[in-house]
């Protein structure tokens, strides 16, 4: 059993939302549920796994933000991307690095998803307190 974590972080790398999915689920279908209802979003920065026209339309219409999503190599039309903004994607990578400093999360010691997410939420609270 593998579990994948999808997260939304703010501009300084603090977690706003986190959602677990089974490891074989795709990344892009999870994005709209994570992003819905966020306020004050200027840019959404994501990697190529989240590159889809419907997600770009959702970001533009519902969030009134611009999508800075790396282009999937299989895409025929290439949308523009501001590479200076895209470099800020390291914030999500740094967040997952901070999260995996907690051994129970990194090694996935918990047998149930409820217990695992309990420790993930506790670690997120600890990250907020630092």
Curated annotation (Swiss-Prot):
Pfam families in the record: DDE_Tnp_1
Keywords: DNA recombination, DNA-binding, Transposable element, Transposition
Source organism superkingdom: Bacteria
UniProt GO BP: DNA transposition
Database matches in InterPro entries: Transposase_11
GO molecular function annotation: DNA binding; transposase activity
Function: Involved in the transposition of the insertion sequence.
UniProt record similarity statement: Belongs to the transposase 11 family.
Protein name: Putative transposase for insertion sequence element IS6501
């Amino acid at each position: 059993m593998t579990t994948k974590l999808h997260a939304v972080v703010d501009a300084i790398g603090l977690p706003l939302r986190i959602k677990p999915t089974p490891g074989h689920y795709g990344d892009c279908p999870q994005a709209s549920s994570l992003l819905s209802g966020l306020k004050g979003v200027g840019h959404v920065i994501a990697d190529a796994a989240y590159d889809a026209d419907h997600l770009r339309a959702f970001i533009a219409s519902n969030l009134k933000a611009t999508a800075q999503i790396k282009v999937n190599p299989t895409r025929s039309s290439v949308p523009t991307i501001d590479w200076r903004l895209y470099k800020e994607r390291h914030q999500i990578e740094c967040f997952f690095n901070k999260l995996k400093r907690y051994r129970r999360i990194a090694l996935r010691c918990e047998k149930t998803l409820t217990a695992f997410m309990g420790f993930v939420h506790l670690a997120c609270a600890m990250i907020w307190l630092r």
